[in-house]
Amino acid sequence: MKKGLIALAAVGMLCVSALGADAPKAPAQKPKTAAKAASQPTLPKPTMEDVHYGPHPKQVMNFWKAESDKPTPLLFFIHGGGWMGGNRTSGLGGLLQEMLKNKISVVSVEYRFIPEATADGEVPPVRGPLHDAARALQFVRAHAAEWNIDKQRIGASGGSAGACTSLWLDFHPDLADPNSKDPIARESTRLWCAAVSAPQTTLDPQQMKEWTPNSRYGGHAFGFKGDKEKKLSQFDEFLAKRDTILPWIAEYSPYALVTSDDPPVYMIFSSPPALGKDQKDPTHTANFGVKLQEKCKAEGVPCELVYPGAPDVKHPTVSSYLIDKLKAEKP
C-alpha cells in the first residue's frame, strides 16, 4: 500500500512538471539549494549519449545498456511537457534504475516540439513529435543486434504528452514500409506494451468537454492559437473548428485508434476520476483513463487503470507493470 501511495505521489509531481503548453509560464525560480539538488535522482551515465536518429538537432536519444549475455527487453521512454518543453531525462529518474536492475535496457528520446515541427512544415504540428517517436523506435530496432536488444519486447512509457505519444504508438497501425530503400523505415513501430502516467487519451475536443467540462488542452497540437482580441481561447477555437479537422483527430487521437489487435496498456493517475465534472487538473484527469479503459474493454484490449481507490489493482506502479510484461516467460 505504501509503495502504491508513493507511486501516485510521483505521478502527481510528474503532472505538475509536465503541464507544458497548458500552464502559464512560472516566474523565474531561485537556484536549487544543495539539499534540493541532492534529492534529485542521479542518473547513471548512458552507454551511448546524443545518438542521432534523424537530421534535426532534437532528434537524438540516450541509451542505457543493461548487463546481460542475451538480448534484453527495452523501455522506450518519451518525456512529457505538452510537446512544448522537457527533455529526455525529465521524469526518468527511478524508472531507469528499476529497469536496469531488472536487466531491461532503456532508451530515452528527444523530439521536435510543436513550434519546431511547425517551422519544419509538419501538418498538423503534432505529427512532428509523434512521427519522431516512431522513427526513433524504428532506429532502435535497426540497431537491436548491436545493442543486444530483443526487438520484440519493447515497452513504451512516459508522462502527460509523452504518455499520449506512447499510447499513439501502441494503438497506431504499423508504420513500417517493407518496400523502402531505407532499412530503418522497414522496421516495425508496434510495441509489446505501454505503461504510462497521466496520459491524454483523446485529442478530440468534444470528447474532452463531455468527459471533463473544464478541459482546456490540445488545440496547439493542431495549430490553433486562439484570438485574444475576440477573447477566444486556444481550446475554444479547437472546439469550434473541430469538424474541419476530423481526419486529423482520427489519425492522431489514441482513443480513435484502438482496435482488437493492439498491445496491452497500463495507466496511472494521481487522483480518482469524476466523469462529467470539472477537475482541478483537467489535463491529467483520470477521466481520460476511465474512458480509454471502456474503449479497450469493448475492443478486447487488456487495459489496467490505477488511481487512488481503484479496484482490482494488479500493478501499483509503472515499473512493476513493465517488469512483469517485458520479462514474462514466452508462451
Give the role of each language-model region.
Residues Q29-D69, T259:
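N-terminal cap/lid segment of alpha/beta-hydrolase-fold proteins
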Residues F77-G80, S108, F139, M267:
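Structural cue for short, hydrophobic secondary-structure segments
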Residues D69-T72, G80-T118, C164, A176-D177, ...:
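Short substrate-entry loop that stabilizes the transition state in hydrolases
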Residues R135-P213:
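Primarily recognizes the serine-hydrolase "nucleophile elbow" in alpha/beta-hydrolase
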Residues S180-P213, T244-Q279:
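The feature captures the conserved acid-bearing segment of alpha/beta-hydrolase catalytic domains
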Residues N87-R88, L95, V107-K151, D312-V313:
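Catalytic nucleophile-loop/oxyanion-hole region of alpha/beta-hydrolase
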Residues Q40-K45, H56, L175, P205-L257, ...:
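Mobile cap/lid helix-loop segments that gate and shape the active-site cleft of serine hydrolases
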Residues N62-W64, V265-K280, H284-P331:
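C-terminal catalytic histidine-bearing segment of alpha/beta-hydrolase fold enzymes
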